[in-house]
Structure formats: C-alpha cells, structure tokens
Curated annotation (Swiss-Prot):
HAMAP family: Asp_carb_tr (MF_00001). It holds the Pfam family OTCace_N. Heterododecamer (2C3:3R2) of six catalytic PyrB chains organized as two trimers (C3), and six regulatory PyrI chains organized as three dimers (R2). This is Aspartate carbamoyltransferase catalytic subunit. Its EC number is 2.1.3.2. It comes from Rhodopseudomonas palustris (strain BisB18).
Amino acid sequence: MTPAPKSSFVLAHRHLLGIEGLSAADITGLLDLSEEYVELNRQIDKKRTSLRGRTQVNLFFEASTRTQSSFEIAGKRLGADVMNMSVSSSSMRKGETLIDTAVTLNAMHPDLLVVRHHASGAVELLARKVDGSVVNAGDGAHEHPTQALLDALTIRRNKGRLEGLTIAICGDVMHSRVARSNILLLNIMGARVRVVAPSTLLPPGIERMGVEVARDMREGLNGADIVMMLRLQRERMNGSFVPSSQEYFQYFGLDQKKLGYAKPDALVMHPGPMNRGVEIDSIVADGAQSLIREQVEMGVAVRMAVLEALARNLPNA
C-alpha cells in the first residue's frame, strides 16, 4: 500500500462543476495534491485506501474513452467501489428524465458522482438533486474542469509556472468546453491567453473572457510558450463552419512550419481525441515538443486529487 499524500488540502466546495468559482488557492491546492499522485502512480503498488467504503458512480451520457477510463482508474486506485453507467444502459434511453435519474441514484446513496452530459448546465442541475459530491466530466460546450486542471499540471511541470506564460489555444473554440475551462483557469493563474481560429469558430464576445484574438496562425503563435490544439467538434456543429478538412489544415492545422512561429522551446498540447491531418500533423503530435501523452498520465493524478479533495468534505471523512 502506498503512503498517504502529505498534502491535507480540502476543496472548499461540495462539488466541482467548473473552473468558474475556484480561486487561485483552490487550483494550486489541487495541483499540489496532484503532483504527489503523479509520483505515487509511478510506484509498483499504486493502491490507496482514502476512498475505501465510498461508492463512485460514473454517469456518462456522452461517449468517452479517456475521461471515463481515467476517472475509473482514479477511483479504484483510491479504493472506491466504482460503478460505470452509460446512456445505453440507463433508463433515460427509455424516457426517464435527468431529474428522475438523479433522484433514483440518490436513493442508492452514492458518495461521488462523475457526470458527463451533452447539454450545458445539465451536471449542475443534477447536482442540486443529490446528496453526494458531483464532478463535472464535461457538459456540452460549457466546461470540462478536470481537463483544464490536468493541462495546468502538465504546463507547470514542464515550464515551472503558469503565471506570465503565453498560451495559444487554437482551433474550434466555439464548441469547446476544454477551451472555456482552460481560459478561465489560465486567467486566474496569471497566464496570457490567446485564441487562434477562423471567425466562424470563435464565439461572439470571446474577448470579454480576457483573451487576445488572432485569426491566423502566424500572428497567433508568435511568442507562444504553449500551443494547445483543439479538434473540430463536428458533433456539435449544425452547419458548415469550415470549407473542408484539407483547407482547414492548410491554414489552421499545426505542422512543423507553423510551430516555428512560436518560441523555439514551445510545447504542444491536445486534449484528445486527435484528428491527425486535420488540426495537427503526426510529426508534431509525436515529436519531441509534444506533451500529449504526458497529459493522459496527468489526467489520472488530477482526478485522484479531485476525488480525494471532495471526499475529505464528506460526512465521516
């Protein structure tokens, strides 16, 4: 059995529904606890007992591989009893409402619920109807807080800080919950955030979120410490936002030439899944400047930290 982490950080919130509402101290506390789990996860014995006797329900109304698997591994390594539910196996497929599902689940007294839903705000609605702690694993185009936290951890481990860095977030900003959560977190932590996309993929009024806006890669990547690529979220598009995948890659896909517009020591990130040859070239994705695989590793550590920090607030914790 691995030793307990030294950090005694407790998240001063019952749920983690988004980055919005978190303080710099909250974020730093979660990242510091995550750092300890990175090291613990690299040991042969990865099991902890901090969630022993707790029940964690992963309720995913959208298909997910990496996020659901990451939360499942995180819960099991902490000793929780983990149950996975998908929309295909839920009563909602038979017409049950989200509220009825929440009330039914609450009657089973789960301690932690990890929820992903296609509708923005659905996770917050569900959280109002349950007694346990809820983690937002992505709601529509609204937020994906644990992705932003794992991205922040990855950046901090490689650059030593977040404050003062220039982060270029490139691609389908319009439909991206990852972009929104990252913008919120990076602004809180004092980074300079720039979004890079064609006008059709920029939400109206994005400047009000405290970002710089660029509509071509040369301008957008100039001086960037981190280049964060986003995929085209065609499942959230009602019409044609780009002429074609080939033309999009020509102007906004990240290849070696465009990466050269950033700082020489710039690092590349992508939340996944990647569309190779659309928003990113394979040579860049698999190259020496890529942090994409490391992001996946950081995801488990961050989700362990989030689950533990919330569980420390639960009754009899």
